[in-house]
Amino acid sequence: MSSRSKRQSHGSTRGKRESESRGSSGRIKKERDREKEPEAASSRGSPVRVKREAEPAAREVPAPALPVVRVKREREADEDSEPEREVRAKNGRVDSEDRRSRHCPYLDTINRSVLDFDFEKLCSISLSHINAYACLVCGKYFQGRGLKSHAYIHSVQFSHHVFLNLHTLKFYCLPDNYEIIDSSLEDITYVLKPTFTKQQIANLDKQAKLSRAYDGTTYLPGIVGLNNIKANDYANAVLQALSNVPPLRNYFLEEDNYKNIKRPPGDIMFLLVQRFGELMRKLWNPRNFKAHVSPHEMLQAVVLCSKKTFQITKQGDGVDFLSWFLNALHSALGGTKKKKKTIVNDVFQGSMRIFTKKLPHPDLPAEEKEQLLHNDEYQETMVESTFMYLTLDLPTAPLYKDEKEQLIIPQVPLFNILAKFNGITEKEYKTYKENFLKRFQLTKLPPYLIFCIKRFTKNNFFVEKNPTIVNFPITNVDLREYLSEEVQAVHKNTTYDLIANIVHDGKPSEGSYRIHVLHHGTGKWYELQDLQVTDILPQMITLSEAYIQIWKRRDNDETNQQGA
């Protein structure tokens, strides 16, 4: 064979090898492209297909990361920043947990008879307020719902699976840790946080229908007993009285009226407003599980905000508590003494003129007294002042007993003790060094007028109670004659009707409080003493030792519905 033919055969052989190498490299490139396609698909949200098409060794790579992710997710679940079903929807995963949310098998284990949301929302084990959950099987409060949380451990140990977040009002199943979505649970959230529409609030005083609690007892919304924890009946009576003042009640039934009020950081006084609003909504809730309410959270706020001046375990004075509470509410709502007004001012605040005259010392000679009376210091002065309530002074009780060795209980008409404010009657007030004569005259009558009958006097040794009975009509008390002449023409409506009467029974330090309230829808009177609620005749109210009274000013278009 010639050298030329050898070169041709060698060239053809090398060409075949090059073509084969190019073909093999093309096949390798195509295979690499096919391997890259599932990786790109995995980034678009199909991780399952990637694991099946990849090599068996790749299937075992993410396995150790799964429990870590699950633990992290369950720990983050305690924060309740976003429902888990929304997170799954964003990630494109709609799994069986959504179906479990709509068909939880443990809803029949809920025991509504043990649910009580009147107490402070804190964990029964850690005493923490953060992420508090209520077990709907036993009614206890626990913290968290992640792994090793108290709620999680409780669900595993006792097989209690349904929990309610007391802050977000969402239901969860533990230990499976998925949210429960069911319309049959709406009555539980309504008991925890009742809400009222403007139409419902407007119709409260027109309804005379009894509501039925879950335990079968019937009650009138607003005429509900308050639990006496130990010695808080003085506060219960005042809170019951204020809850039956329609403008004040309507304001606090609608949380939007006060929830956006700006307060300084760390201000604890606004807690009083929040707790009072919650108590009002519970007292007027027509769908309560029980026919009574515990004021525990409200009283905890009172103890905190009053710096333990008023306590749950120690008897207090109703007038002192009423005075402090109204002023604290006014201040917490952003009110000031002169300029900024609140709902408390609009409802209860009136005004009067106070005339004051200084008296010479009684031990001075008569001639020196006459000379001092001509000085400017001893001339009568007048100041304008506002008031939240009027203090009515009782005549001194007799010291002697009758022929049957019983103390004489005197009686006095209401108009006799109201004469203090006619602008003519003078009363002497003594201080440590000086004596004054004062007289009072009303210049403005509020829509709701509070009378505080002064029954207790303190001396250096003990507190003495005046048992004098005040005779008063239930309706048609006209106060026009106690206004100054120039104000009488401006005040068209000066007639008042009684709506609440607080009574103190027993000794000053060992007595108890009860209250008579008028239900506007039925026009009937009811007596409330802690958890006891009974109806009472209007004629029986005047026989009691009245201590605090709330009177409603009658409008021109208003008719008398009390029938007394």
UniProtKB/Swiss-Prot annotation:
Residues that bear Phosphoserine: S46, S81
Keywords carried by this UniProt record: Cell cycle, Cell division, Hydrolase, Isopeptide bond, Metal-binding, mRNA processing, mRNA splicing, Nucleus, Phosphoprotein, Spliceosome, Ubl conjugation, Ubl conjugation pathway, Zinc, Zinc-finger
EC number, as in UniProt: 3.4.19.12
Record field: compositional bias (Low complexity): 59-69
Main location (coarse class): nucleus
Subcellular location, record wording: Nucleus
A Pfam family this chain is assigned to: zf-UBP
Binding site for Zn(2+): C135, C138, H154, H160
GO molecular function: cysteine-type deubiquitinase activity; zinc ion binding
Family: Belongs to the peptidase C19 family.
Protein name as it appears in the record: Ubiquitin carboxyl-terminal hydrolase 39
Organism the protein comes from: Mus musculus
